[in-house]
Amino acid sequence: MIRKKASPHCLHDVSGSCPHLSILLHSSRRPESAPVPCLLPMEAKIPLLTPHTMGRFHLAHRVVHAPLTRSRCYNNLPQEHVQLYYSQRATNGGLLIAEATGVSETAQGYPNTPGIWTKEQVEAWRTVVDAVHQKGGVFFCQIWHVGRASTNDYQPNGQTPIPCTDKKITPTVLKDGTVEEFSAPRRLREDEIPQIVDDFRIAARNCIEAGFDGVEIHCAFGYLIEQFMKDGVNDRTDKYGGSIANRCRFALEVIQAAIDEIGSDRVGVRLSPYSNCLDCWDSDPDALGLYMIQAMSKLGVLYCSMVEPEVVKVDGKVQIPYKLWHFRKVFAGTFIVAGGYNREEGNRAVSQGYTDLVAYGKWFLANPDLPRRFELNAPLNKYDRSTFYTSDPVIGYTDYPFLSPL
């Protein structure tokens, strides 16, 4: 059996209508598996809850909602349940990054993921953005193109997916025995690449038109931009292949196009140099990451969100590799880390100056009031991995419980 699953990238750090929207905004169904929150004594303000100025944005705390694909945007449109999901997690002065959003028809590769290349999509996102802004949140939209991580079924007119290479992603046997397999791709011609760059530029403009405060360009987890960046995939012999400078050329052209369109103070970038997701790896991730960080600093990129190498547990405790120091020291803008962080490790990372902000995925999807739970040192709801990528507009999406009012 061949099965397509939703994007694994967004939950690494861990990215119809709702008839009862007004009710659900204030009360959510408690999953049977979720613990009843029991508040512990408050303590002095923790590092994660101290303010931070990110360019023009004055953030009240450092707990960031990571971009998380959830496969619930039917027909590539965010609907009322999506509005509810983000508004539940919005806080005054808190930064949320919306799920990976396609820049064009050819950008799609997974079921029920949103886009922002049409007027209808822009208007649909506007209602979501308005709901977040009404609660004082700062809202960025992650924009992407999946490249070879697609099948002909998701491409316009059944055409072949278009990455930097003709190499196909190796089929993967999933835990349930099914197989994840992508279609054989067609290498982009050099003369086609400017159109993809322009798609990102237009998407950035559309995000601002929809009301977003900025965009995060997805240069991570094995999707199109990273496919160009990493030598484990990029086998081109033109100006977009070979040296690090050539392999990063496409990424920097996209970033520059977005900056030219909406300003560097509204552009963030996500990188995962150590990841090998989707057969996308590099022989020298340190050099690759450093090259990108230095170039992004020169361009005045607002923030860089970087993903830790694989996190392990020792005696039940999360062990963060802390391998991003050299990138943090070089980057001139706001630095965001992600990848396995909990409350304790997040506080440690901020207090030691390792990062400015910490992005949370799985814990934020399961705890809509995560900053408050961190403040009170309250127990966290357990996330249900089986509902990460299902299409239900409520279960595993908007029904995770809040803490009881004090």
From Swiss-Prot:
It comes from Oryza sativa subsp. japonica (Rice). The gene is OPR8. CDD domains: OYE_like_FMN (cd02933). The active site is at residue 223. Belongs to the NADH:flavin oxidoreductase/NADH oxidase family. Keywords: Fatty acid biosynthesis, Fatty acid metabolism, Flavoprotein, FMN, Lipid biosynthesis, Lipid metabolism, NADP, Oxidoreductase, Oxylipin biosynthesis. This is Putative 12-oxophytodienoate reductase 8. Putative oxophytodienoate reductase that may be involved in the biosynthesis or metabolism of oxylipin signaling molecules. Substrate binds at residues 218-221.
